[in-house]
């Protein structure tokens, strides 16, 4: 009964789209052999415990945490009742085994750890985690395909396969677990004399309770959850996006308790003689009841091409030395930030994952490096590439692919609307830098010609610092970078770049000194600019004038230094403004703004001037804090219109905080309309209450068809 519940319960069906969570065959055996070793002390059992712990941990980093949590809890349980030296020697053996597991797993974890250090944001923030935390009601949510609770009755809420919070294991499992606790409490004579073994139902009840609280994530009923938050702040849970997955341990504990409950119930059934004793019949009934509650039909199946069904394009690529990208992707949705904060929002996330998953599958045939893929985490570079590729085949897209080292584009005609096939054929065959290498019917293979790129240390840099800041408060500053060369710049690594800030008073005494990091620019065409945000955690506490020195330490730009006079005084801030005013001017050539191709991303430059008497906040310390406290942040706002709004209202981050009267240049990226034509572009300033203020700039924009 317990084995069926853990291996084939509804939760495993709900995780069909997450094979790494479904796959947990070694977890029960790990605990089994740990129990045997703690009871008998046989080295064979210790070795098997370590092997099963390692095997399960290597299947997913989630399971590394799950294994160590379950084993650690059992270790503490045993340690609390241990008195003799032999028992402590066994406990020491368990610690050595767990240490050996970590040593073996560490080399495989190093790439992950390097990526974590290299990619800003490669960890789960609390806002994201809360969205994937369980609620008590989720333990009564059944799969929509459940035979008993969906098709026959509608007593319970329903969830779909792939959803993370479908956690109802069936009523029988709960009842059998209650019987296990009741049997333990009554201390029946058939229970083992060994106190450790006699207390195991209570241990699994404890494991279920701990796991239940962990599935709740950062908060339980709106209150801080120390069981989750303490290890999170220690860095132990920052890579786990879905606290609800701790349900695996809850399910394991529940399954064991259900097994105990079944044994206790059957021990009360007489009639053990005969060819088919009554207790076996009742056991079969209980198993059938548990199985009935966990029947989920139909099981979704998808047939994937194989053998001769593999598309010709991938067979063609097998023979080539290539780095590829497959286009087009399924359409990307409307993201309102295209600068430093760029989420990845497919219009249909499920369909996008299916398509990219299939492309990853085909990569096993052609075995070439590819830009495509999907994950639970999308780095900024991935997001930026595919938003840029919405304009493919534009010259800007080709230059980006050249900088990335992409040699071939696999173009899928089945993803092109029939009414636009002629347009795309013309553009694909006429765009400089692309050559048709193979026409395979449903797919074209386009060769990307080699192109030059400039070096990051060729970029021009200017530090942008607020002239006046508020005493004792953090403030934002920035690095304006511009590509003065005739070649594009592409920085494929997202290694954080270090900087040092030193603030000194009029006598040369250091008042504040701190270090930080920033993300390098990703892609800049010839003449294009961008802003790299920096932050100072604390301004001087006294009003007056200071010297601020910004040192860029060794990195892609080399060593550079900037010095400024920094004023400090009290003033109203945009969180609680007095007079909120501002002006935006277009910094490009006068007349109609011409954007060569529809969709994708395109750079525009504006000059922003703060008016009124209020200090304008550009950003907060983290994205998480910006989501939690949006009020008071001031952004550039852009809206394309043609007989009504086109796309969403877009945002651009100010280069630095702006005190009244200061003016700065703001290069930003916009997403043009996806259809060629004439548009109006409204540009102004907005606070995060989505209220525009100050003067509004109106530009005439011509979006070309990509042929120019």
Can you annotate each of these PLM segments?
Residues 14-21, 128, 135, 151-167, ...:
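Membrane-helix boundary/interfacial segments in multi-pass membrane proteins
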Residues 33, 38, 67-100, 181-193:
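Perimembrane helix-loop-helix junctions
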Residues 103, 169-198, 206-213:
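Hydrophobic, aromatic-rich transmembrane alpha-helices
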Residues 49-52, 86-110, 125-131, 135, ...:
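Hydrophobic alpha-helical membrane-interfacial segments at the cytosolic entry of transmembrane helices
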Residues 125, 189, 285-464, 470, ...:
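Extracytoplasmic
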């Amino acid at each position: 009964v317990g084995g069926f519940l853990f291996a084939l319960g509804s939760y495993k069906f709900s995780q069909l789209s997450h094979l790494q969570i479904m796959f947990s065959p070694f977890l029960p055996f790990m605990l089994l052999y740990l129990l045997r070793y703690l009871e008998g002390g046989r080295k064979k059992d210790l070795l098997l415990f370590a092997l099963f712990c390692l095997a399960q941990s290597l299947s997913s980093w989630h399971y590394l945490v799950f294994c160590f949590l379950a084993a650690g809890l059992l270790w503490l349980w045993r340690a609390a009742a241990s008195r003799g030296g032999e028992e402590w020697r066994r406990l020491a053996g368990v610690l050595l085994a767990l240490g050996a597991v970590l040593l073996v797993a560490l080399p495989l974890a190093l790439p992950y750890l390097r990526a974590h250090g290299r990619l800003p944001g490669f960890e789960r923030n609390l806002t994201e985690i809360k969205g994937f935390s369980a609620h008590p009601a989720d333990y009564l949510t059944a799969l929509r395909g459940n035979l008993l609770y969906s098709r026959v009755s509608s007593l319970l809420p329903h969830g779909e396969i792939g959803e993370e919070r479908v956690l109802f294991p069936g009523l029988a499992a709960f009842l059998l677990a209650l019987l296990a606790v009741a049997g333990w409490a009554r201390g029946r004579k058939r229970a083992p004399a060994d106190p450790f073994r006699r207390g195991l139902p209570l241990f699994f009840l404890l494991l279920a309770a701990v796991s239940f609280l962990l599935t709740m994530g950062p908060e339980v009923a709106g209150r801080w959850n120390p069981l989750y938050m303490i290890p999170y702040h220690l860095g132990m849970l920052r890579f786990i996006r879905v606290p609800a997955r701790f349900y695996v341990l809850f399910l394991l504990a529940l399954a064991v308790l259900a097994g105990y409950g079944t044994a206790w119930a059957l021990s009360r059934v007489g009639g053990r003689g005969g060819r088919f004793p009554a207790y076996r019949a009742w056991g079969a009934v209980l198993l059938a009841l548990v199985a009935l509650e966990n029947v989920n039909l139909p099981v979704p199946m998808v047939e994937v091409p194989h053998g001769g069904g593999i598309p010709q394009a991938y067979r063609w690529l097998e023979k080539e030395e290539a780095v590829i990208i497959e286009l087009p992707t399924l359409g990307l949705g409307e993201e309102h930030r295209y600068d430093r904060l760029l989420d990845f929002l497919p219009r249909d996330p499920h369909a996008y994952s299916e398509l990219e998953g299939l492309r990853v599958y085909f990569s096993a045939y052609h075995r070439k490096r590819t830009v495509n893929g999907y994950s639970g985490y999308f780095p900024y570079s991935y997001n930026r590439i595919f938003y840029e590729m919405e304009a493919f085949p534009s010259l800007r897209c080709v230059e980006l692919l050249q900088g990335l080292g992409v040699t071939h584009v696999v173009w899928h005609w089945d993803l092109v609307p029939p009414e636009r096939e002629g347009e795309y054929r013309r553009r694909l065959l006429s765009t400089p830098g692309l050559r048709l290498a193979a026409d395979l019917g449903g797919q074209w293979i386009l060769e990307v010609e080699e192109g030059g790129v400039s070096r990051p240390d060729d970029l021009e840099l200017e530090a942008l610092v607020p002239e006046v800041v508020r005493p004792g408060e953090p403030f934002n500053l920035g690095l304006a970078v511009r590509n003065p060369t005739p070649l594009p710049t592409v920085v494929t690594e997202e290694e954080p770049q270090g900087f040092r800030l030193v603030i000194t008073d009029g006598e040369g005494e250091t008042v504040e000194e701190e270090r930080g990091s920033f993300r390098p620019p990703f892609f800049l065409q010839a003449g294009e600019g961008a802003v790299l945000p920096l932050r100072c955690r604390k301004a001087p506490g006294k009003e007056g004038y200071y010297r601020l020195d910004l040192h860029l330490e060794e990195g892609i730009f080399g060593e550079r230094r900037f010095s400024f006079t920094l004023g400090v005084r009290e003033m109203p801030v945009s969180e609680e403004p007095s007079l909120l005013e501002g002006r935006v001017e277009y910094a490009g050539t006068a007349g109609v703004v011409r954007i060569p191709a529809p969709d994708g991303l395109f750079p525009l430059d504006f000059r922003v001037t703060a008016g009124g008497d209020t200090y304008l906040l550009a950003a907060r310390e983290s994205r998480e804090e910006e989501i939690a406290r949006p009020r008071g942040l001031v952004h550039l706002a852009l809206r394309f219109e043609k007989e009504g709004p086109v796309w969403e209202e877009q945002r651009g981050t100010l280069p630095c905080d702006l005190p009244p009267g200061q003016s700065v240049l703001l290069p930003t990226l916009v997403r043009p309309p996806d259809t060629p034509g004439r548009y109006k572009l409204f540009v102004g300033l907005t606070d995060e209450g989505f209220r525009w203020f100050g003067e509004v700039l109106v530009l005439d924009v011509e979006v070309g068809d990509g042929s120019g």
